[in-house]
């Protein structure tokens, strides 16, 4: 048995596209890519707008959290002071 060769056979292509056809194909492809790019830019603009709104809301939430943390610290501090003053009053003989 004889092995077939691995070397590709040469095929001559007689129907290669003309330069004007290639140019038309490339222009159509560029137009498609440009429309996709414009669509993506529009989506990006919408996402940036939403992100700006969300960033402001997150800033306000951060300020609210900080104020709650400071208020709870003050309440805990006042409760500790009150508890220690009550303990001192009980220890003092009259």
From Swiss-Prot:
Pfam families, sorted: DASH_Hsk3
Principal location listed in the UniProt entry: nucleus
Sequence segments annotated as region (Disordered): 1-25
Keyword Ion transport (UniProt): no
GO cellular component assignments: cytosol; DASH complex; nucleus; spindle
Subcellular location: Nucleus; Cytoplasm, Cytoskeleton, Spindle; Chromosome, Centromere, Kinetochore; Cytoplasm, Cytoskeleton
Low complexity: bias regions: 1-20
Keywords annotated in UniProt: Cell cycle, Cell division, Centromere, Chromosome, Cytoplasm, Cytoskeleton, Kinetochore, Mitosis, Nucleus
A Gene Ontology biological process term: protein transport along microtubule to mitotic spindle pole body
Domain of life: Eukaryota
Assembly and interaction partners: Component of the DASH complex consisting of ask1, dad1, dad2, dad3, dad4, dam1, duo1, dad5, spc19 and spc34, with a stoichiometry of one copy of each subunit per complex. Multiple DASH complexes oligomerize to form a ring that encircles spindle microtubules and organizes the rod-like NDC80 complexes of the outer kinetochore. DASH complex oligomerization strengthens microtubule attachments. On cytoplasmic microtubules, DASH complexes appear to form patches instead of rings.
Stated role: Component of the DASH complex that connects microtubules with kinetochores and couples microtubule depolymerisation to chromosome movement; it is involved in retrieving kinetochores to the spindle poles before their re-orientation on the spindle in early mitosis and allows microtubule depolymerization to pull chromosomes apart and resist detachment during anaphase.
Family, as annotated: Belongs to the DASH complex HSK3 family.
Name of this protein: DASH complex subunit DAD5
Species, as recorded: Schizosaccharomyces pombe (strain 972 / ATCC 24843) (Fission yeast)
Gene this chain is encoded by: dad5
